[in-house]
Amino acid sequence: MKKAFRAAAIAAILLFALTFIGNAKIKSASAHLLFSSSVSVGGNESREVTLKSDDRIAIGSYLGEPIVWRVIETGGKTLLMSEKVLCFRAFDPSEDGIGSSDYFASPLRAWLNSESGFLSPENFSEFDLSLISPDKNGDSIFLPSKDMLKNISTADRRRSPTEQCIKNDTSRYLTLRKYCWYWTSSPVSTNQSSVTAVTTTGGFYKTLAADELCGVCPAMYLRSNVLVLCGSGTAENPYALAGGGER
């Protein structure tokens, strides 16, 4: 009787230990996407890396999903662009159904740089924001221009929506394919109401500024000399950053 009780107790202890170890491994595997300003970085825990085109970096979140950014350019400043379309939103949701192609006066630009909008504390911590270097217009987040994207292959320009983007779409007219259209900041020179967008095939075409079915795939500049906390820079295991450098 005592032997049976002892065996049962040992089995229970082993089961608890295996469960604890398994949960620890799961948490460790996902840690590279769940970082914030509360992370403590020791002198030997972070490392310097030379970022290259197509490296992936996790900064912030949207609709509860971590945002993975792709390195687009590494010249004077490191340009990042969202790996996926984060939401569908009109460039200028005008009542006339047409709108204006003026990006600098657009509600979309204002939303991208507003704490009540895209830069909500729910999406970006103070640490996340410290990693961003504003562009020449003082914007932390912006839509990529056609010129920024013209040297990227059509295949690499294509973007698919995030899972939460699809779940939160309110348009009953939207038929989602693998890839979707998304905005650039570039107006169509011959039409004050049309904006250049990237299509499902990765090409450029125009759409009305009031189009609510066009996606938002934002861009940002990364501050210089950042340190990497963990990750390998791939889509599956993006870099998590530890700060450093100048904005």
Describe each region flagged by the PLM.
Residues 27-247:
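Collagenous Gly-X-Y triple-helix signature in extracellular proteins
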Residues 4-5, 22, 30:
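Intrinsic N-terminal pre-sequences and regulatory tails
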Residues 1-12:
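N-terminal Sec-pathway targeting helices
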Residues 14-24:
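Hydrophobic alpha-helical membrane-insertion segments, chiefly the h-region
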